[in-house]
Amino acid sequence: MANHPLTLEKDGFIVTTLDAAMAAAQKNSLWYMTFGLARCAVEMMHAAGARYDMDRFGMIPRASPRQCDLMIVAGTLTNKMAPAMRRVYDQMAEPRYVVSMGSCANGGGYYHYGYSVVRGCDRIVPVDVYVPGCPPTAEALVYDLMQLQRKVAERSTHSRPKLFARP
């Protein structure tokens, strides 16, 4: 028998692990909801438009947090809006991811010293990827979303305890 790697064309089957299958499925089906609060939200709309087309990466916008596993926070987060953002995050499906887009969402930005500004959305929800810039370009958002996809694909089922927990 020849020493060759297993392929679908030669052997008629594919060998994989549950980790690899779950990672590939989840990586290519990130459904996102936008939490647009300022100018960065306009750049987020550009990324979802025809020129950059986030749909080709398997990222589909959803209106309900219960159908989403990715939240993109774009803009200045105020103290009054923080509880609403946390409530939306808690309603999202597990496993869930957060992208902080722009200087205001990352650390308060231009309004950092304002009395009503939260100095970074990572004080309210855990953030997986930060997109720098004021406002960040659509290219930067798409690049960081691809980095998030890589991060999701590298996770194993060991880090997803709720999905495979025994009753």
From Swiss-Prot:
It comes from the Bacteria. One of its GO terms (biological process) is electron transport coupled proton transport. The keyword Ribonucleoprotein does not apply. Pfam families: Oxidored_q6. It is found in: Cell inner membrane. NDH-1 shuttles electrons from NADH, via FMN and iron-sulfur (Fe-S) centers, to quinones in the respiratory chain. Couples the redox reaction to proton translocation (for every two electrons transferred, four hydrogen ions are translocated across the cytoplasmic membrane), and thus conserves the redox energy in a proton gradient. Belongs to the complex I 20 kDa subunit family. NDH-1 is composed of 14 different subunits. Subunits NuoB, C, D, E, F, and G constitute the peripheral sector of the complex. This is Putative NADH-quinone oxidoreductase subunit B 2. It comes from Burkholderia pseudomallei (strain 1710b).
